[in-house]
Each structure stands twice: as structure tokens, then as C-alpha cells.
């Protein structure tokens, strides 16, 4: 399956995954910041940062990708329908 076809056909899955990653980043940041007296846990900090960056990349990517597909694609002729028709004569 074409990965770009997945984004083109189901962009809502990517948006939901990006929102879930943002929620995970917020939860990890809250847990890290609630430990005021203890030293910061580097694992929670790295999970929070990585989740936030991936979520922002996914959400911005799907916004830019959908905008590109809407405004920048030209008319593409599907030539496969002509090649497979039974009435085509080869001369």
C-alpha cells in the first residue's frame, strides 16, 4: 500500500494520532513539573519532547499535505483505463 495514499485517503487518523501524541506530551510534562522537590526525570522529559515534536510534525504535515493536494495538483489523466479496455485495437 502506498504510504502517501494512506494519508490522502485517511487524514483523520493522522490528525487523531497527532492529538494523542500531544496529550501524551502534556501528561509527561505535567508529571515532570509536579515533582518540584525531586530532580527531573530525564526519561519523562525525553518522552515529552519527542511526543511534542512528532505531534507537531504530523499535524503540520497533514495540513500542508492536504493544502498541497487541494491547490497544487494538476489534472492527471489516468491512462490505465485506456490500456485495459477490450475494444482497443493495436495497429
From Swiss-Prot:
Pfam family, one: Pox_A14
Protein modification: Phosphorylated by viral F10 kinase, phosphorylation state is regulated by H1 phosphatase.
Subcellular location: Virion membrane
Annotated transmembrane regions: 13-33, 47-67
Entry GO terms, CC: membrane; viral envelope; virion membrane
Matching InterPro entries: Poxvirus_A14
Domain of life per record: Viruses
Membrane topology: Multi-pass membrane protein
Ranges facing Virion surface side: 34-46
Intravirion compartment segments: 1-12, 68-91
Keywords: Disulfide bond, Membrane, Phosphoprotein, Transmembrane, Transmembrane helix, Viral envelope protein, Virion
Main function: Envelope protein which is a major component of the mature virion (MV) membrane. Essential for membrane biogenesis. Is required, together with A17, to form bona fide crescents, which can progress to form the immature virion (IV) membrane. A14 and A17 form a lattice that is stabilized by disulfide bonds and serves as an anchor within the viral membrane to which several other proteins important in virion structure and morphogenesis attach.
Subunit organization: Homodimer; disulfide-linked. Interacts with A17.
Record-stated family: Belongs to the chordopoxvirinae A14 family.
Protein name: Virion membrane protein A14 homolog
Species this protein is from: Fowlpox virus (strain NVSL) (FPV)
Amino acid at each position: 500500500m502506498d504510504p502517501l495514499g494512506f494519508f490522502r485517503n485517511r487524514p483523520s487518523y493522522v490528525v487523531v494520532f497527532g492529538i494523542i501524541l500531544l496529550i501524551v506530551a502534556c501528561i509527561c510534562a505535567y508529571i515532570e513539573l509536579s515533582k518540584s522537590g525531586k530532580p527531573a526525570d530525564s526519561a519523562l522529559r525525553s518522552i515529552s519532547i519527542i511526543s511534542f515534536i512528532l505531534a507537531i510534525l504530523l499535524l503540520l504535515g497533514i495540513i500542508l499535505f492536504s493544502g498541497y493536494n487541494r491547490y497544487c495538483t494538476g489534472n492527471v489523466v489516468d491512462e490505465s483505463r485506456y490500456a485495459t479496455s477490450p475494444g482497443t485495437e493495436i495497429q
